[in-house]
Amino acid sequence: MKNTFGQAVTLTLFGESHGAAVGAVLDGLAPGLPVDGDFLRRQLSRRRPTTALDTARQEPDNYQILSGVFQGRTTGTPLTIVIPNENTRSGDYTYGLARPSHADYAAYCKYHGYEDWRGGGHFSGRVTAPLVAAGAILLSALAGVGVTVGTHILRCGDAWDRPFADRAAADVAALQGADFPALTDEAAQAISAAILAARERQDSVGGITQTAVCGLPAGVGEPWFDSVESLLSHAVFSIGGVKGIEFGGGFSAVCGYGSDFNDSLRMENGRVVTETNRNGGVNGGITNGMDVVFQCAVKPTPSIGQPQQTVDFLRGEDAELTIHGRHDPAIIRRICPVLDSVTALVLCDLLTQRFGTDYLAKGAGL
C-alpha cells in the first residue's frame, strides 16, 4: 500500500475527499528554491471548478505549508502542504452501491471494508489539489533551469484543437496565461460546447490531452525500466481517469514506414536537432534534446445523472443507481494542471538523479 512516487525527489499524497484535509509531502528538494505563493494559488485555481463546465463543489483550497519552507525558500527538509476540505456533502453517497467505473468495489476488496468511501475517499480527484500545489513548486524549480511544461486539450468529444508545433516553446508559453487550456479560441469554444452538451444530457464526455516539455537537456533518463517514457507513464496513470498514453506520433507509427516516421538529424548553431519530432523527444528511453511530447486519453467522468445498472456488494444483489451528487461533465479541463504537476515531479526526480541535488537550485542563483 504505497502512496509515494520518486527516488531522489519524492511525493507522498494523503487524505480523503470528505476527510478533514488532503495533503502532500515533498522530499529531496534542494534547499534555497523559491516558493512563489502567487504561482501556487494560480495553479490551484486552474484545477479548481469555476464554471458551468465543472462540478458544483466549490472548495477555496486555502493551503497551508506546515514544514520545509522558511522565509519563502525551501529548507531541503520534507515540505508538507495541507489543504482543508471545507465543502463536503457525504449524504450524496450510499455505501455498498458500487458506482459504475468508480473504484468503490475495488477499494472495498483491497481494504476489506475499512476504507473511507465518502466521495470516493482516497481515490477522489480531490486528492489532486495537493498534488497541484506541490507541482507548482516543482514547476517553478524547473523554470529556473530553463525547462517549461504545458498541457492543452487536443480533443474533447468531437471538438479538436491543433497539436503543438514541432518546436512547442511558444505554444507552451502562451498556455501559461490562458484562461482555458486550448491553443486557439475556436477550439476553446467548441470544446466548451461539447462539455455543456454532455451536461444537458445528464452525461459526460472524455478526450485527449497533449503535454509538451521544452528545454530539457539531452541525456536524461535510463535505458530500460526507468526510461523517461516509463516513468512519465507511471506517474500519468496515477491520475484517475487517464486510460492511455502515447509519445510523439505514438500509434500513428503503425500506419507508415520507417522512411515516414524517422526523425532526420542536422546541426543547428552547434547543436544536434531533428527536423521532425515524431519520437516525442525520447530515443532509447533517454531525452534527445528535443521537446518531450505525449498525449493522454482521458475517459468520460463516470458519475452521470442517468440510471445505471450496478450491484449492492454488501447485500450481494443487483441494483439500479442514479447519481445525484456534484460532479464534472468532463474532467479534461481540470486535469491539465494535474498532468503538468506529475510531469514536473518526474523531471525533477530524473534531473536530480542525473546532475545532483543542487542542480535545480542553480536557477535560484545558488
Language-model-detected regions and their locations in the chain:
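Generic N-terminal targeting/processing segments that precede catalytic cores or assembly contacts
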Residues: 1-366
